[in-house]
Structure formats: structure tokens, C-alpha cells
């Protein structure tokens, strides 16, 4: 008989990639909509921004649990990812032309991918993952073909490293899972810090 699936945490994210990554390491979780506006503050660095948004998502999720007696009060994980090129923060493309421009700007360059992850209950803890990704030179035609697949449209920086854009990546230094949207090493550190024994289901 299969053991009962009981969540260790809530994941405050609508991202299927983050859910897939937690599944990979055996974390039992329930997910919720974070409902947080991702607006860069004036003079806010990308590092501070991703940690703040990750923490705001986790805090908002935990507050919603406190207000809902029907749901079990568990720690809430939040995460946020941004792509940074020449100190410019690249979020999700606003449309086709913006997405094509974004991908063209990444062609033949090295950019940073920052992912902040937070875990909140009556405690709060955060971690930051910083990765460097180098794209080969991209042809305009392949950028347009890639956009037409629909894959880039909801991704920070306009690409998914685990998808078709894998063929653009010449070099990666850092966390592959962090570039996907949830750095598993840092996420596991937070789970360990909160004494959540996710490995018991391995």
C-alpha cells in the first residue's frame, strides 16, 4: 500500500518547473498562488530584489495559511529568478518584439541568473544562487523559430535552459536547477535548517 502523501511544506509558486524540481528530490509539498507584485524598487540591486520577492512570496503564503483554519500550518517556500545582463535586469518578455530583442541581446554574451529562495514559518531564512550562463552567437532566424515555439514567453530572460534553449548554452558556471528557477542545493539547505526530513521518502 502506498504511504499517505502528506506535504512537508507549501510552495508559493505557479511555476511548473519549480514543482518539478521539488519532485526530483522527493519533497512532499502543496502549492499555492503567491499573489505578489514583482516590482523592482528604486536603486534596488538585482540580488536584493530576488531575495525580497522570494521572501514576500513565502510570507504572503504563510499569512494566508494563518488565516485559513482548513489548511495545515506548514512552512512556505518562495522563489524568484531574474536574468541580469550588463547590470540590466531582464524579466519575462512583454511580447514578441521584446522577447526577440532580449534573446538577441543574450547572443554571444555571458549573463548572470540570480535565484532567491526563502522559507518562512515563525522563522525566516533565505539563500541566493548566482550562476553565469554563456550563449553562443545566435542567428536571427533561430531566435524567431525559438520564439514561435512558445517556450520563451513566460521565462525570465526569455529562455528555458531545460528546453530547446539548451542548444544555445555554450557554458554554465553555477546551478543548473537555479537557472531553471529553484536552486536545489540552497533549497535543501533551508529544509535542513528547518529540520524538515524530506529524505525519509527516498
Curated annotation (Swiss-Prot):
This is dTTP/UTP pyrophosphatase. One of its GO terms (molecular function) is dTTP diphosphatase activity. Its cofactor is a divalent metal cation. The keyword Cytoplasm applies. SUPFAM superfamilies: ITPase-like. It comes from Alkalilimnicola ehrlichii (strain ATCC BAA-1101 / DSM 17681 / MLHE-1). Belongs to the Maf family. YhdE subfamily. The record marks 17, 81, 162 as: Important for substrate specificity. It is found in: Cytoplasm. Keywords: Cytoplasm, Hydrolase, Nucleotide metabolism. GO terms for biological process: nucleotide metabolic process. One of its GO terms (cellular component) is cytoplasm. It catalyses: dTTP + H2O = dTMP + diphosphate + H(+); UTP + H2O = UMP + diphosphate + H(+). Its EC number is 3.6.1.9. Its main location: cytoplasm. The active site is at 80 (proton acceptor). InterPro entries: ITPase-like_fam, Maf-like. Nucleoside triphosphate pyrophosphatase that hydrolyzes dTTP and UTP. May have a dual role in cell division arrest and in preventing the incorporation of modified nucleotides into cellular nucleic acids. Pfam families: Maf.
